[in-house]
Amino acid sequence: MSSKNLAGYLLAISPIVMIVMFAAVFPAVLGTGEEGLKGEALAKASIEAGMEHVHLTYVVATIGGLAMMGMFLGYTLWARLLQGDDKKGNALVVVASIAMPVAAAGMMMSMDFNFAAARAWIKGDEVNALTIQAVAEYAGNNFIWTFIFLSVGFTGLASALQTTDKISKTVGYILAIISVIMLITVSYTHLTLPTSDLV
């Protein structure tokens, strides 16, 4: 299978699987704890919701995490396919192909905190479990997503600049615009978040 085909399959399938796992299956089957909780109460509720069916939690989280990594790999391959010194937007996709794996590594570390919290909770180490889960709740909220949206936007823009097909060009520009909007939204949300919501 060529890199182009692999990137296409990953970008077509992985986001769907990820959304289904994290947005539909996880809340429906495992629950998310009570709404409006903060701090230690939020961390404890998150762990308890997952520990009620711990093996199912591991399966759902693993499938969702692998789908997320597949999506990141798809974007990385897409960015690398667009590289070339004589191609428009080469600098953009060079940056994207470096930034996306960095973001993926950060997201993997953030997810691994959840697994670590679960292991600590199962062993009866509630204090460390709550501490690790609190880190997992807030880790990767802004900086990692900045890398992701920039990478996706750069790749979409470079694709639009290089292609001659009107549909592909339109899709590339739309992807770039959506990435900019999401980047601004995430940054604005965190910059205007009340101090009371951070603790």
Where are the predicted features?
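Alpha-helical transmembrane segments in multipass membrane proteins, preferentially the mid-helix core
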Residues: I148-I167
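Interfacial helix-start motif at the membrane-water boundary
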Residues: I47-M68
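Membrane-interface interhelical connector segments
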Residues: A116-A139
